[in-house]
Amino acid sequence: MKEAEVLKYEAFTSSPGKGNPAGVVLQGDDYTEDEMQIIAERAGYSETSFIRKSESADLELRYFTPGHEMNLCGHATVASLYALCEKGMLESGKTYSIQTKAGILPVKISEKDGRIHITLEQASPQFKPFTGDRKKLADALGITDEDFHEDLPIVFGSTGIWTAIVPLKSLEASKKMVPDNKQFPEVLVDLPKASVHPFTFETVHPDSDLHGRHFSSPYSGTIEDPVTGTASGVMGAYMKHYGNAEQHKFIIEQGQEIGKDGKVEIEMNEAGGHVKVNMTGTAVYSETRILKI
């Protein structure tokens, strides 16, 4: 029987027990695709990343939820690169290329306030209209359609993974959501496997710009993601595209409703008519588990 060493890191926080936990497997080349899926299922984190050698980049990352493989995962990328830097396998002050199923993406490692920070350039933002029933979506989230923001549209967005961006009127609406994600596929008729990412301009922390929550597709094996890097990147791009935001940097908070307080920094730069979305976060080591497969 094979074993797998799974390191647990919590991303987008410097406090153990907060942020978004991810499993990190340093010896990803030792396992087949089926074995990686089994490891992710038994680890039970929203995502587990497997670090592998790459012929076209500095390294490859593959991401698995308990239910299926993902093209990209922001918090697991932060956790993986933080782990490699902490163990002396990568250096601060350098930019590395990582191969993912969303493409080859640059990742910068830097130090700020005495901590390692990871900056991931996400894929170019894309948007698609939501044509489903707003009342059914509200019902699936445990709120009413009156809780939706009147002036901003519900759309699907992606910087590597598709999610439904749902603007809300208030923090109170965010707090009272109790999702039934089994309803998502029939509500998200345009992209039935997408996740749902509601957000509001009202925040818990005064230094935050936006407050979000992230509810997973029922196919992923989880219900709520505590702090979501890729969806936060989509939120920043959404604010530029639909919110006419003049600012290029956003501090996005998430996880407060479930005791996993975390923050993601999103910065956008426009060049040649394209928007580049950069996501920055730190992480903290939690524990090591040995799983039999």
From Swiss-Prot:
GO molecular-function term, one example from the UniProt record: isomerase activity
Active site: 47
One annotated GO biological process: biosynthetic process
EC annotation from Swiss-Prot or TrEMBL: 5.1.-.-
Keyword annotations: Isomerase
An annotated GO cellular component: cytoplasm
Family: Belongs to the PhzF family.
Protein name: Uncharacterized isomerase YfhB
Organism: Bacillus subtilis (strain 168)
Organism phylogeny: Bacteria, Bacillati, Bacillota, Bacilli, Bacillales
UniProt gene name: yfhB
